[in-house]
């Protein structure tokens, strides 16, 4: 039995299947962890979601911002953008089945025996793992509640409040939790977010750092696997932090990480998110 984690798919099914074939992934015995952003912008969002649903019993995945955007469009609380490739999902005959399954997924997963957390964007420095799991659970509960789902999805968009406070309530509370777990890149040591900057490590606004770079980060004892930040190209220079979004949908690579051995496997992608020939994944022993 092996456990593999893969970076943002964004509807790029060919590279995922190429990687899984290379490691001889067997859904009957192996596990696949996904860091979110399963769909959108790539060429096969519907096919990707259908494939993941077909192996759902072997799958652990967390939701990313694009997945939440899909749920909002499905519930008619947000219009699709010109760059979105989600309409085929919403109009598919099995849309309700797929998206009802999608909204059951977590925002934060913790594998206690391994001491590993799986999240789309990250855990803010002022939260312990326990606090992050507790607050993620608040959003997860609403996503699974038919009566509160639309209200949450309608109110989740926006950059304010830009910092957590225990006094927050209602949709503002859920929005900042969501932004930390699915959109965060740079923040201050007290968790004030900058959600506009999207480039690499050396581009932090004054007073801000990558969320994982704060020396007093309270989840430092936990190994964290995340995606979301393609500009990092998998490089974080921080022990115990595994960045898996390597920009497949932008013509970069898709990265698979063996959770137990620490080995990486990468597959080159074309600008449209398909395989770039020759489709021979490259094995990497050490962190990129």
Curated annotation (Swiss-Prot):
Q: Where in this chain does the entry annotate a coiled-coil region?
A: none
Name the keywords, alphabetized. Hydrolase
Keyword Hydrolase assigned: yes
Q: What is its EC number?
A: 3.6.1.41
Q: Which domain of life is it from?
A: Bacteria
GO terms of molecular function: bis(5'-nucleosyl)-tetraphosphatase (symmetrical) activity
The record's section on InterPro entries has: ApaH, Calcineurin-like_PHP_ApaH, Metallo-depent_PP-like
Q: Which reaction does it catalyse?
A: P(1),P(4)-bis(5'-adenosyl) tetraphosphate + H2O = 2 ADP + 2 H(+)
TM spans (from-to): none
Q: Name one Pfam family in it.
A: Metallophos
Any keyword Hydrolase? yes
**Top-level EC class as recorded in UniProt:** hydrolase
* HAMAP family with a match to the protein in the record: ApaH (MF_00199)
- Function comment: Hydrolyzes diadenosine 5',5'''-P1,P4-tetraphosphate to yield ADP.
The family note in this entry says: Belongs to the Ap4A hydrolase family.
Protein name as annotated:
Bis(5'-nucleosyl)-tetraphosphatase, symmetrical
As recorded in Swiss-Prot or TrEMBL, the protein's gene is named apaH
